[in-house]
């Protein structure tokens, strides 16, 4: 049970870090103030969820997990190449939507992979997925 709990927490931790990093990568290029505010609000939500994740990891005496270096590097390269084009708001919404969809898919994969995780940690993972789903819906008008 504890093993599944820690593994699920680590995946949540890495995913949240990746999400915050991606939001940072695109926010500076966004032209619409409304979109910038939406992304900033999502970053704040992800940061709060990340802080909760860190508290749980400390309780289990675990340092967490960093996003895969290659995935992080490829995300940054894609963001930088794409955001240098015109229609920055559309491109930002597109990139973040893709990232959210990957995050949602991964979270549910890990929820299924670690069924013995504690309920409070499963709830946290579902809260992260819900935050991603909300952002995807909110970004639709910018696609």
Q: Where are the regions that the model predicts?
A:
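Carboxylate-rich helix-loop segments that flank metal/cofactor sites and access channels
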Residues: 55-105
